[in-house]
Protein backbone atom coordinates (compact mmCIF):
# COMPACT_ATOMS: atom_id res chain seq x y z
CA UNK A 1 0.00 0.00 0.00
CA UNK A 2 1.62 3.24 -1.14
CA UNK A 3 0.65 6.22 0.97
CA UNK A 4 1.93 9.70 1.66
CA UNK A 5 1.44 9.20 5.38
CA UNK A 6 5.17 8.79 5.81
CA UNK A 7 5.64 12.32 4.46
CA UNK A 8 2.90 13.73 6.69
CA UNK A 9 3.77 12.08 10.00
CA UNK A 10 6.76 12.48 12.27
CA UNK A 11 7.37 9.30 14.26
CA UNK A 12 6.77 8.46 17.03
CA UNK A 13 3.31 10.03 17.06
CA UNK A 14 -0.24 9.33 18.25
CA UNK A 15 -2.31 7.65 15.54
CA UNK A 16 -6.03 6.88 15.80
CA UNK A 17 -7.74 4.04 13.96
CA UNK A 18 -11.51 4.12 13.54
CA UNK A 19 -12.79 0.62 12.88
CA UNK A 20 -16.39 0.07 11.75
CA UNK A 21 -17.80 -3.41 12.12
CA UNK A 22 -20.81 -5.56 12.86
CA UNK A 23 -22.18 -4.98 16.37
CA UNK A 24 -20.95 -8.20 17.98
CA UNK A 25 -19.48 -8.41 21.50
CA UNK A 26 -16.18 -9.82 20.23
CA UNK A 27 -15.51 -6.92 17.80
CA UNK A 28 -13.76 -4.73 20.39
CA UNK A 29 -11.70 -7.65 21.73
CA UNK A 30 -10.56 -8.60 18.23
CA UNK A 31 -9.54 -5.01 17.44
CA UNK A 32 -7.56 -4.69 20.69
CA UNK A 33 -5.93 -8.10 20.14
CA UNK A 34 -4.63 -7.07 16.69
CA UNK A 35 -3.42 -3.71 17.97
CA UNK A 36 -1.64 -5.36 20.94
CA UNK A 37 0.39 -7.57 18.56
CA UNK A 38 1.92 -4.53 16.85
CA UNK A 39 1.73 -1.78 19.48
CA UNK A 40 1.56 -3.28 22.99
CA UNK A 41 -0.09 -1.00 25.51
CA UNK A 42 -3.01 -0.39 27.83
CA UNK A 43 -5.95 0.51 25.56
CA UNK A 44 -9.46 1.68 26.32
CA UNK A 45 -11.15 1.94 22.94
CA UNK A 46 -14.11 4.26 22.45
CA UNK A 47 -17.15 2.39 21.11
CA UNK A 48 -20.15 4.06 19.49
CA UNK A 49 -23.18 2.22 18.09
CA UNK A 50 -24.74 3.16 14.76
CA UNK A 51 -28.19 4.75 14.78
CA UNK A 52 -29.91 1.40 14.12
CA UNK A 53 -27.50 -0.54 16.33
CA UNK A 54 -26.34 -2.89 13.56
CA UNK A 55 -22.76 -1.60 13.58
CA UNK A 56 -20.21 -0.31 16.07
CA UNK A 57 -17.45 2.22 15.57
CA UNK A 58 -14.33 1.41 17.59
CA UNK A 59 -11.75 4.20 17.94
CA UNK A 60 -8.34 3.28 19.31
CA UNK A 61 -5.22 5.46 19.52
CA UNK A 62 -1.70 4.05 19.46
CA UNK A 63 1.74 5.58 19.61
CA UNK A 64 2.97 4.77 16.11
CA UNK A 65 6.71 4.24 15.78
CA UNK A 66 7.03 3.79 12.00
CA UNK A 67 4.99 3.77 8.80
CA UNK A 68 5.17 -0.02 8.39
CA UNK A 69 3.42 -0.43 11.74
CA UNK A 70 0.62 1.94 10.66
CA UNK A 71 0.10 0.17 7.32
CA UNK A 72 0.28 -3.33 8.81
CA UNK A 73 -2.40 -2.44 11.35
CA UNK A 74 -4.67 -1.04 8.61
CA UNK A 75 -4.31 -4.30 6.71
CA UNK A 76 -4.77 -6.66 9.66
CA UNK A 77 -7.71 -4.73 11.13
CA UNK A 78 -9.37 -4.72 7.70
CA UNK A 79 -8.94 -8.49 7.45
CA UNK A 80 -11.00 -9.18 10.59
CA UNK A 81 -14.25 -10.94 9.65
CA UNK A 82 -16.51 -8.56 11.61
CA UNK A 83 -14.83 -5.40 10.26
CA UNK A 84 -16.40 -3.54 7.36
CA UNK A 85 -14.11 -0.47 7.15
CA UNK A 86 -10.98 1.01 8.74
CA UNK A 87 -10.27 4.74 8.72
UniProtKB/Swiss-Prot annotation:
It holds the Pfam family DUF493. GO terms for cellular component: cytosol. InterPro entries: UPF0250_YbeD-like (IPR007454), YbeD-like_sf (IPR027471). Belongs to the UPF0250 family. NCBIfam families: PRK04998.1. This is UPF0250 protein YE3006. It comes from Yersinia enterocolitica serotype O:8 / biotype 1B (strain NCTC 13174 / 8081).
Amino acid sequence: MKTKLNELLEFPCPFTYKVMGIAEPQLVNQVVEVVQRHAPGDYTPEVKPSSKGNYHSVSITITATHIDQVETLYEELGNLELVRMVL
